[in-house]
């Protein structure tokens, strides 16, 4: 059995070896549990594929369909999704840039794009920077999609769509930051409403492989009524390949003609080494992923116990998927930047306010500030638990001591 990948690196190794954003954006005394990057070594089969490419000088431009074929094989095996056709895919630089390119195919400047707040901050930034209007459809209090609020947003967006008549909905499946894994029934409810109101759905499924025990991922394109939708996938989150740029845009059967209109130059953006790494991850990284999922399952249980014992007043929402947990710190009484009126321009994912600012300044623990995730985010923090048990325990211990000193 492959050992837990989360326990292979010490804090000292991470601080000395890592030069990425997670470990360099803050001083060395800060424990960084903010950006979605895992504290793991590169999966061995992925490292081997990259070494072969470098040794062979295979460092040119990407070409071919192996990435899409690997995703199709993975989807068949893991999710029993058998109708992903390679001919309805396109390689894009990464998931967010792919989302922008897909939205350009189905919307015009000024058109509405609906999101479920609180949600991944770049949803606001990338959409608004490209001239589209963000319309929030807030989640329910339990962190799940509110189908009534979504229907109201669809109706409102349809009424305000202007002469183009274009409306898009950007779905986060699984949801970041809450870790909710949408059920097949929820996705069918989305598809039915999208059909009724003429809304095109674009599903960000970058966290799809990261579902530990207890939940099941359903690809949005696999549900009835999603034939004119799109999905974006990559191996970057599940195998820690964020710096090796490549992702896959996938069209439903009725959206294939739209995807075919994507400009050819978009395919120049992905890295050839990125394509090699992502292909290897989906095709040969399954055993490593299973070991990671076991480690994440242990860590989310540990984090829940640590919060219950050491952080009174903080509510821990059990994440069904991803390696991100959403902590409700509103009972702690911190002043926080108001997010309820913000629907655009939340571009700075490192912006800090309220509890996240406190924990950085007084506990030397870097978390993501809830207000940047939009409506419903103020008073919350997002914590990345894809690290060692020792680092997780130390981080919560520091947070606890800082709150005791505040009293």
Curated annotation (Swiss-Prot):
Question: Carries keyword 4Fe-4S?
Answer: no
Enzyme class, broadest EC rank:
lyase
Q: Which cofactor does it need?
A: pyridoxal 5'-phosphate
Documented EC number(s): 4.4.1.13
Give this protein's Gene Ontology molecular function annotations: cysteine-S-conjugate beta-lyase activity; pyridoxal phosphate binding
* Name of this protein: Putative cystathionine beta-lyase
N6-(pyridoxal phosphate)lysine found at: 237
Keywords, A to Z, come to: Amino-acid biosynthesis, Lyase, Methionine biosynthesis, Pyridoxal phosphate
The biological processes this protein is annotated with in GO are: methionine biosynthetic process
Entry-linked PANTHER family: CYSTATHIONINE BETA-LYASE-RELATED, PROTEIN MALY
Q: Which reaction does it catalyse?
A: L,L-cystathionine + H2O = L-homocysteine + pyruvate + NH4(+); an S-substituted L-cysteine + H2O = a thiol + pyruvate + NH4(+)
Would you say which domain of life the source belongs to?
A: Bacteria
This protein's GO CC annotations:
plasma membrane
Q: Which family does it belong to?
A: Belongs to the class-II pyridoxal-phosphate-dependent aminotransferase family. MalY/PatB cystathionine beta-lyase subfamily.
Pathway per the UniProt entry: Amino-acid biosynthesis; L-methionine biosynthesis via de novo pathway; L-homocysteine from L-cystathionine: step 1/1
């Amino acid at each position: 059995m492959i050992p837990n990948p989360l326990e292979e690196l010490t804090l000292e190794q991470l601080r000395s070896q890592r030069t990425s954003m997670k470990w360099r954006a803050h001083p060395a005394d800060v424990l960084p549990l903010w950006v979605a990057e895992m504290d793991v070594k590169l999966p061995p089969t992925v490292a081997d594929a990259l070494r072969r490419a470098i040794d062979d000088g295979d460092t040119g431009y990407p070409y071919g369909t192996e990435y899409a074929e690997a995703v199709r094989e993975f989807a068949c095996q893991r999710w029993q999704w058998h109708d992903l056709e390679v001919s309805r895919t396109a390689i894009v630089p990464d998931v967010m840039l792919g989302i922008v390119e897909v939205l350009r195919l189905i919307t015009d400047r000024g058109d509405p794009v609906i999101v479920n707040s609180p949600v991944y901050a770049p949803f606001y930034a990338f959409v608004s920077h490209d001239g589209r209007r963000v319309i929030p459809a807030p989640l329910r209090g339990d962190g799940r999609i509110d189908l009534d609020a979504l229907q109201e947003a669809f109706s409102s967006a349809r009424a305000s769509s202007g002469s183009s008549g274009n409306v898009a909905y950007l779905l986060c499946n699984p949801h970041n930051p809450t870790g909710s894994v949408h059920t097949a029934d929820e996705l069918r409810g989305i598809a039915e409403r999208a059909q009724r109101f003429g809304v095109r759905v674009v599903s960000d499924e970058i966290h799809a492989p990261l579902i530990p025990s207890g939940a099941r991922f359903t690809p949005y394109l696999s549900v009835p009524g999603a034939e004119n939708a799109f999905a974006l996938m990559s191996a970057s989150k599940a195998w820690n390949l964020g710096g090796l740029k490549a992702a896959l845009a996938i069209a439903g059967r009725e959206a294939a003609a739209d995807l075919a209109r994507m400009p050819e130059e978009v395919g120049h953006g992905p890295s050839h080494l990125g394509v090699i790494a992502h292909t290897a991850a989906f095709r040969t990284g399954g055993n490593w992923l299973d070991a990671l999922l076991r480690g994440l399952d242990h860590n989310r249980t540990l984090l829940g116990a640590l919060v219950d014992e050491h952080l009174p007043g903080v509510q821990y929402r059990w994440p069904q998927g991803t390696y991100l947990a959403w902590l409700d710190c509103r009972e702690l009484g911190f002043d926080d930047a108001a997010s309820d009126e913000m629907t655009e321009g939340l571009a700075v994912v490192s912006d800090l306010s309220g509890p996240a600012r406190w924990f950085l300044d007084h506990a030397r623990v870097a978390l993501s500030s809830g207000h940047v995730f939009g409506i419903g985010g103020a008073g919350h923090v997002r914590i990345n638990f894809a690290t060692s048990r020792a680092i997780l325990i130390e981080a919560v211990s520091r947070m606890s001591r800082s709150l005791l000193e505040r009293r």
